[in-house]
């Protein structure tokens, strides 16, 4: 069994959260970067014995369309998966539901979901003067 991180993290915040969570799971880790527009995601075949973490940010309360489309190309084969939605300055609204729909279509078995708060990527705390 190995841990597979499927991550869409254009600014690195979601990746940090994913690594923190997956780092608690004791196994070898493989990362699939959904930000790579040129990658052939259909080449990834996940084993039912693998544990998968799917992480992406919430953009305006929605899952990024590019991330969802790329996720749908990966064969989940019944592997257990945890969804992680990372959001900053507002609510995550439908993001987890959209991630769940895409993961199920890809053949993953959703076991848990996490909504994690991270620093807002457009307006980092270092730029806010209070």
Give the residues covered by each predicted segment.
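Short N-terminal binding/cap micro-motifs at the start of the first secondary-structure element
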Residues: 12-18
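A short, Lys/Arg-enriched amphipathic alpha-helix followed by its capping loop at the start of a domain
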Residues: 20-28
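A Lys/Arg-rich helix-loop hairpin that forms a DNA/phosphate-binding surface
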Residues: 31
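Helix-loop-strand module that forms the ligand-binding subsite of alpha/beta enzymes
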Residues: 34-121
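Conserved small/polar residues in nucleotide/adenosyl-binding loops
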Residues: 128-130
């Amino acid at each position: 069994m190995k841990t597979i991180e499927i991550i869409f993290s254009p600014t690195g915040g979601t990746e940090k959260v994913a690594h923190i969570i997956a780092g608690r799971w004791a196994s070898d880790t493989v990362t699939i970067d959904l930000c790579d527009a040129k990658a052939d995601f259909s080449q990834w075949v996940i084993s039912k014995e693998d544990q998968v973490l799917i992480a992406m940010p919430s953009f305006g309360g929605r899952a990024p369309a590019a991330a969802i489309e790329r996720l749908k190309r990966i064969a989940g084969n019944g592997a257990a998966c945890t969804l992680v939605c990372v959001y900053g300055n507002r609510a995550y609204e439908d993001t987890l539901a959209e991630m769940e729909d895409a993961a199920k279509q890809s053949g993953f078995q959703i076991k848990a979901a996490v909504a994690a708060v991270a620093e807002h990527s457009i307006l980092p705390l270092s730029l806010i003067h209070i």
